Amino acid sequence: MSILSFLLGEKKKTASVAKERLQIILAHERSSHSAPADYLPALQRELVAVISKYVKIGNDDIKVNLERQDNLEVLEVKIEIPQA
């Protein structure tokens, strides 16, 4: 190990980065095959209604996603807010 590589740290190999990305994609695909929660569309509509009181947004500006892994459920909400 050279001093330069010690100071700068080792870079991840391209294969390991690709493997990590593939694992993330596979986990997402597996979770999307399960039945979606019934409340997600209503939740998305209500979020649009509440946020629209303060900022002009549309239905396409909010993405709601529910991911399930083993005993864990993660609710992800992405909101695109226009710049002032």
Curated annotation (Swiss-Prot):
Gene Ontology BP term (one): cell division
Pfam families in alphabetical order: MinE
Keywords: Cell cycle, Cell division
InterPro entries referenced in this protein's UniProt entry, alphabetically: MinE, MinE_sf
Top-rank lineage group of the source organism: Bacteria
Function according to Swiss-Prot or TrEMBL: Prevents the cell division inhibition by proteins MinC and MinD at internal division sites while permitting inhibition at polar sites. This ensures cell division at the proper site by restricting the formation of a division septum at the midpoint of the long axis of the cell.
HAMAP family in the record: MinE
Family membership noted in the UniProt record: Belongs to the MinE family.
The protein's name in its UniProt record: Cell division topological specificity factor
Organism: Ralstonia nicotianae (strain ATCC BAA-1114 / GMI1000)
